[in-house]
Design a protein with these regions (language model features):
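C-terminal helical subdomain
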Residues: 176, 183-186, 195-234
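Conserved Rossmann-fold cofactor-binding substructure of NAD(P)-dependent oxidoreductases
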Residues: 54-70
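Conserved glycine-rich Rossmann-like NAD(P)H-binding loop of the short-chain dehydrogenase/reductase
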Residues: 18-36
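Conserved glycine-rich cofactor-binding loop
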Residues: 6-7
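N-terminal Rossmann-fold NAD(P) dinucleotide-binding loop
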Residues: 10-11
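Catalytic loop of short-chain dehydrogenase/reductase
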Residues: 82-109, 117-118, 124-176
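Rossmann-fold cofactor-recognition segment
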Residues: 41-57
């Protein structure tokens, strides 16, 4: 299951999972023409699901809508996110300290930090039903406290740092059940959020993410890695 599947990294994750023959629940807030095209190409492999991780009622409805359609989720990838309340992509004006508002901070946290935890809470029983449940929370190096040496990105960076600490806590809580939880940064990717100057294509990033997911073992619980599996600073 992948959240934020209407475009960018999420859509490419759904595409590559379906292409290798696996079933994927492609969850997104509003869907897209590209996602509908993917569903049409693989109607037996791609399940489109309306889900807004920033809205508890939407998450509850999404879980109810999936009832009876899948028995278990082997890998849950919390990919949905926003750069800021005002824009899904990087915006230099949104990085300045004097432009940050309480409303922006709260809304960014609601989607980027609280959202993944809400999704996990309501879909965890399906992950538990898998003999090899894995949860990947898509984070960012911008959320690394020890690597933060510049100003800016206040709402986005703080929300990803919050996601990181919740990932660590959840990893410790679920490890006794054999469920592996990690935080992963996809790299700087050419998407609507990353922009055209980014170093990686969605295809490259997603190949790496799926490779990392396939190789996870219980000893990896609580790690923060990049799309190549390299440890990242907290």
């Amino acid at each position: 299951m992948v959240t934020g599947s209407s475009g960018g990294i999420g859509l490419e994750l759904a595409r590559q999972v379906a292409a290798r023959g696996d079933r994927v629940v492609a969850a997104s807030r509003q869907g897209s023409a590209a996602l509908r095209k993917l569903v049409a190409a693989h109607p037996d492999r791609v399940i489109e699901l309306a889900l807004d991780p920033g809205n508890q009622e939407s998450v509850i409805a999404a879980r109810a809508g999936l009832e009876g359609r899948v028995d278990a989720i082997d890998i849950l990838i919390n990919n949905a996110g926003v750069y800021s309340r005002w824009s899904r992509h990087w915006d230099p004006d949104a990085t300045l300290f004097d432009t940050v508002t309480q409303e922006e901070l709260v809304d960014t946290f609601r989607i980027n930090a609280a959202g993944p935890m809400l999704v996990i809470e309501h879909f965890l029983n399906l992950v538990r039903a898998s003999p090899r449940g894995r949860i990947l929370n898509v984070s960012s190096r911008v959320g690394s406290v020890s690597a933060k040496t510049s100003g800016g990105d206040y709402a986005y960076a703080a929300s990803k740092a919050a996601l990181n600490i919740m990932t660590r806590a959840l990893a410790a809580e679920l490890a006794p059940e054999g469920i592996v939880v990690i935080a992963i940064t996809p790299g700087w990717v050419r998407t609507e959020m990353g922009g055209r100057a980014a170093a990686l294509s969605p295809e490259e990033s997603v190949r790496g993410i799926l490779s990392v997911a396939a190789k996870l073992t219980p000893k990896d619980a609580g790690r923060f890695v990049d799309y190549q599996g390299e440890d990242q600073p907290w």
